[in-house]
Amino acid sequence: KVPDYLVEDTLKPTKTPYHEVISLEDTLPRLDVLYMTRVQKERFFNEEDYIRLKDIYILDQEKLNLAKADMPVLHPLPRVDEIATEVDADPRAAYFQQVLNGKFIRMALILSLLDLTDPVTGKKVLVC
């Protein structure tokens, strides 16, 4: 659920359209991209709610088959149980590439912060 303060402070003032859904299966056919995250135990006020909800939003191959053929699945990793390992073999599973891209971005950011020069040419090392 989108927290009320985000709805009131951000979504409504900017007239950003959104809708909340309960069923992953009902939503998958309409999505262009699926960004999965784990159900975060530390965000729940009580253990009972976490236990009741933690297994509802699990993506497996059966559910993924409901999605568009070109819909990428993203996830920040590491995962817990929210994406079945069988999904890893599906060409839409883009989370490993996502992690690799993130690694390269961090490397480029660090390199640009170091402001290095090439010892042979004396020129600044460019990040591109």
Which residues does each PLM region occupy?
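Glycine-rich phosphate/diphosphate-binding loop of Rossmann-like nucleotide-binding domains
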Residues: 1-36
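Glycine/threonine-rich flexible loop motifs
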Residues: 38-57
